[in-house]
Amino acid sequence: MNLIVANGLEKKFQNKQVVHGLDLEIKQGEILALIGPNGVGKSTTIAMLLGIIQPDKGSVSYWRNDYKKHIGAQLQTTPFFEGYSARENLKLFGALYQVKLSDEEINHKLACYHLSDTGRTPAVKLSLGQQKRLAIGVTTVHEPELIILDEPTAGLDPRASHEIKKMILNMSENQRTVLFSSHNMDEVEEIADRVIFMNHGQIVAAGKPEDLTKKHQVKNLELLYLKLTETVK
């Protein structure tokens, strides 16, 4: 089953075509990676899928009428209250999503996010990796069916990135669907079931990582990235 189907999405900003003729599907249960250079329309595409901005042309259809209640989205802005602790943030976001969390449930979530030792520390004082994990935690506190993460490992060291990857894989094991964007091709190759590659506002390649590398006769996604973004002189 498809959770989201987008057809012919177009978006301009100040006469610049940011997204052009974009078609995509998000399939239930998959980990889908959206990749491509900076400025090719990935974040704009995500915003259109979420209904944050409206496309100039095209349509987006959803698997249920109340889809907004069943999506958790962590974008590139800080989604939590910086002056409150991780524990307090989980309780606050639970209330926003009308989910009443017991102390036991909050303790369990903090353990899952590896934040048990810092659960009472103000979020602003957490490390970047801890803040990223908390950001995912508060945006998924209502156990959404679809989770959208915009560059969740950006700026993180390998250990912190590894923790985020484990969280994403755990979501998939718990029957969640995940769409994430990334510039780390090793990361994408490691955890993504399917990849959508964007360039110049369009999808230029899509499929399973192993199928794409085989089709384009390259050893890995990093080499495919270089091939598809090569500038012809």
Placement of each model-derived feature along the sequence:
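Conserved ABC ATPase "signature" region
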Residues: K91, A95, L101-T118
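Conserved ABC ATPase signature
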Residues: P122-L126
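Conserved ABC transporter NBD signature motif
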Residues: G58-K69
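ABC ATPase "signature
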Residues: A206-G207
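A short, surface-exposed alpha-helical micro-motif characterized by mixed small hydrophobic
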Residues: V188-E190
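Catalytic Walker B motif of ABC-type/P-loop ATPase nucleotide-binding domains
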Residues: I147-E151
